[in-house]
Amino acid sequence: MFERILPWSLQGIGPFLNTYGDVLFFRHIRRTPPIETNPRASTSVHSIVAHRFVYAYLVAVKSLLYHFSDITVFVHDDGSLNARDRELIRAHMPEAIIIDRAEITRRFDHDICDPFLSQVRSSYTSYLKLFDPTFLRHGQRIILLDTDTLFLRAPTAVINWARNGGEPWYHLAPRGNMKATSREKSATSQQEPHIQTLIMNDLVVLNDELGRDYRLEQGFCAGFVGYSVDLVDFKELRELLTCLYAKFGDRIFRWGAEQAIHGLLLCGKGAKALPIQDYFVYTQNNAGNVANATFVHFVGENRFFRFRYPRLAARLMRNLAGS
């Protein structure tokens, strides 16, 4: 009953924290000093940033820059950043490049001149991760970093890759339930399989039709990946998306499709998973492993489980403030 009356943000502690936790837990990032980055570096780090996660983003990216700052920082506005957000970002990373969503959309539509690709790109915000870093073609290597992430130690393997190049890579979510106790799936989820499941079930046929060798590793997560600027080819991407649209229709315009397509492209071109004991997606089942992690991705409804995310962020902010 109350779910029909109350807004989603007030329907429980999880929705409330996912809506307002940015200001509650991460605002003290404002007290940390700026970090100089390199706008001409061979590797760039790209994040899609929303107004309501701007503090969390600064904690995430500065937790990386604390260990390695010889990198170009691209902040992709999801369309909600305001003037104060932009000022805040520039105050903490003076050399960061902020990409205005409306402007890059105009550029993309004009330069690529492909209505179908433009439709896919604009259908869901996370698709900006798939299209825009490649469209910008800055330097030699691309890192994608979600805003709900933390580096707890120096990511040595990633730093070496950023300096010297190498094979593409990604991080993993563990297999099994994300929660310690599973609940019954909703009728909607039972009726409509996730797009990634549909693609996995049809992968052999998909490869035969396209003459490709796409693969998709179980647990692939696009929230922290690295690859060369020429790995994503828009001609190949159009062929893949056209085939997927013919099979699955508007499902390719919804949540999860961008990650699945990123997975096909990277895994199909030899990407390797970072060691899951060091780089992983946080769940209720692996919460005890955080103390030994290098990188943790705090996704969805598990983000504030046991409040480890804000506690670790608070420690990082203290370290940054003293640096």
For each feature predicted by the language model, list its residue ranges.
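A glycosyltransferase accessory/donor-loop signature
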Residues: M1-S42, L198-S323
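Histidine-anchored nucleotide/phosphate-binding helix
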Residues: H51-F68
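Short internal beta-strands
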Residues: T72-S80, Y170-A173
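Active-site-proximal specificity loops/subdomain of glycosyltransferases
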Residues: L88-L136
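Short, surface-exposed amphipathic charged segments that create phosphate/polyanion-binding patches used
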Residues: D109-R121, E184-T188, V290-T294
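Short aromatic/hydrophobic "clamp" motif used to bind/position activated sugar donors
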Residues: I142
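The conserved acidic donor/metal-binding loop of glycosyltransferases
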Residues: D146-L150
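Conserved donor-nucleotide/metal-binding helix-loop-beta segment in metal-dependent transferases, i.e.
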Residues: F151-T188
